[in-house]
């Protein structure tokens, strides 16, 4: 990337047949319906005062970011999975059902579901490699060897899981929208007009991607686990579970660091492992998928501009 002042950072994620983008004040999802139209799901960003305090504390802000992303991501995934294959004539019925279950309770339930889903997957990818590595102890008994083998099993499980997911038609399209999301962000950060042609000319990889974060948890975990014993097995399992927040917190800081130094020769290499993983989690999007991502991002920019304008103090002219 060229050296320039980067505009305000926006994040996003791919959903079923669409893309969600989040800003300081709003979240916007755009999806392509079966009739070819583009539908939007817009929500104001809820700022929890306590969570906002935590988000300013290094190593803890990563946990807060995961909680927030889990809550909002689940809502937008639900919208996309429910709407993309639904006939537009059925929208009103679905909206009435959604209103009955809206409110704080729905937000909290989605947050819990999102966090629990993340933790479950983290437990699986954390504990299964522990037991697999333990099987090799008769041959590799040293602490460092056990940790290295455990990390290798984690990487194999992760890559295998992503590869088999990508073979399904639905997830392949989600990965294409993931690529479209990155391309739009890269185009925006290059200060280029956000057109289909300009967006398609951008890389489908990005330093701030959550895929990179997942890979960093494996790398960071390998070093953190060197500080604790690997024997006996029961203590090793407890250590791995107890250290999940620590690994997540450090990994988030590493992700932020790689994004900050991405324009510095030599240091930008720190982010390469995450970019390599994105070669699996993103695919080159089609023009119509890029159009959806652009519509989502432009709508977010419009809402963000309105919010910023409304927050400016008015001056009465006398």
From Swiss-Prot:
GO terms for cellular component: plasma membrane. It is a multi-pass membrane protein. Pfam families: DUF1385. The chain crosses the membrane at residues 112-132, 147-167, 209-229, 237-257. Keywords: Cell membrane, Membrane, Transmembrane, Transmembrane helix. It comes from the Bacteria. It is found in: Cell membrane. InterPro entries: DUF1385. PANTHER family: MEMBRANE PROTEIN-RELATED (PTHR42867:SF1). This is Uncharacterized protein YqhQ. It comes from Bacillus subtilis (strain 168). The lineage of its organism: Bacteria, Bacillati, Bacillota, Bacilli, Bacillales.
